[in-house]
Amino acid sequence: MKQFIVLTVVLLAIQELQGGSVVTVDDKCTCKDTLNTLTKGQLIDRLVLCNQRNDNLEKIIDGLKKENNILRKENDGLRAENCQLSEALKREKEARQKAEKALKECQKNTENLKETIEQLKKELAEAQKALEKCKKELADCKKENAKLLNKIEELNCTITQLQEKLERCRGRERDLQCQLDECKKKLNICNNELIACRKQQEELRCKIERLNTEIEKLRKQNAACEKDLNTLRCETSEFLAIATQRQSQLTSIIQRAEGESSAIKASYIGFRNSHDLTCAPCAGPA
């Protein structure tokens, strides 16, 4: 009966070792009868053998329990690591959403800046056209001024010649006056010559007055032209200052936009390079 109990314990140990599969001793099994037929020495030998097997099984069971404990600890560690990775993934997703939102805002700002730049380019082109027109008008005014100066110079030369001629006529008149006493006999001829000289003098005087009037008129025109030229120079200087300021502002805006775009691009590239954006379910980039 004791041998039967030992055998039952051994079978139960084997059952636990095999993963809980049910092993029972049937009432109709002939093992009991076989054990009853064995001698006492044979039963002792078999019991010793069973005890050895039982010890071996206990060692195996202890080893499996240790491995089970190790696996359980590893499982707990993996669970904790999984929780940490889940939290990290959640934070990374939130950071990525913020980065994408910032990128969209930056792109929108970039588009606005591009529109502003295009508008400024159009205004700059119009300003350059206006500047070219002002330069052309200034050049035309300078040419007209040069023509007027040349004409004034020519008129001055003509006046000088007429004045010299007038002086000669006056000298001749004086000579005639001096010779008048001596030339009483030639009085009629001298009077005619005198009348002719006076007439010529009057014509020259009228001509000189007309020339003086024309010179004065030309001087007034020249003064008006100089005034317009100075006004045009002032307007050109103000326009150049405004154009230079706008060009400087445009250059500053372009450089700042390029700097911000480069910084955001570098930040986005650094973010992608320093963070694992792989999505676990699809094994692709998030």
From Swiss-Prot:
GO terms for biological process: double-strand break repair via homologous recombination. GO terms for cellular component: nucleus; Smc5-Smc6 complex. It comes from Bradysia coprophila. Residues 61-235 are annotated as: Helical. The gene is II/9-2. It comes from the Eukaryota. GO terms for molecular function: single-stranded DNA binding. The DNA puff II/9 proteins have a proposed intermolecular coiled coil structure with possibly intermolecular disulfide bridges formed by numerous cysteine residues in position D of the heptad repeat. Glycans are attached at residue 156. The keyword Signal applies. Residues 1-19 form the signal peptide. This is Puff II/9-2 protein. Keywords: Coiled coil, Glycoprotein, Signal.
